[in-house]
């Protein structure tokens, strides 16, 4: 079974590195959802030899994913991580705000 994964903060350095790691491990791009702020909506991020389109976090449906990797900073995590968790999504937050 493949997990559907949201990379929240996909346009930042850590988010791009997470995309690189998943691509290097041959994860299917159809299971990856790059997410960022509304100002980044529609931009493209590299995923191996493919480009994925970034979705705005305020329009993204957390029910689409099984796992969300947050690397967008404490304020984003504080606001959005609980909403992802409420949709039965596993949340891994690198901001440490929820510790």
For the regions a language model picked out, list residue spans one by one.
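N-terminal Rossmann-like NAD(P) cofactor-binding subdomain of oxidoreductases
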Residues: 1-97
């Amino acid at each position: 079974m493949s997990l559907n994964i949201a990379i929240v903060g996909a346009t930042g350095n850590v988010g791009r590195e997470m995309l690189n790691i998943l691509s290097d491990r041959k994860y299917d791009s159809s299971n990856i959802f790059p997410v960022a702020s509304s100002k980044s909506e529609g931009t493209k991020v590299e995923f191996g030899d493919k480009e994925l389109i970034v979705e705005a976090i305020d329009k993204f449906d957390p029910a689409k994913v099984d796992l969300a990797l947050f690397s967008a900073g404490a304020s984003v995590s504080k606001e959005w991580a609980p909403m992802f968790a409420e949709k039965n999504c596993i949340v891994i937050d690198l901001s440490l705000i929820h510790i």
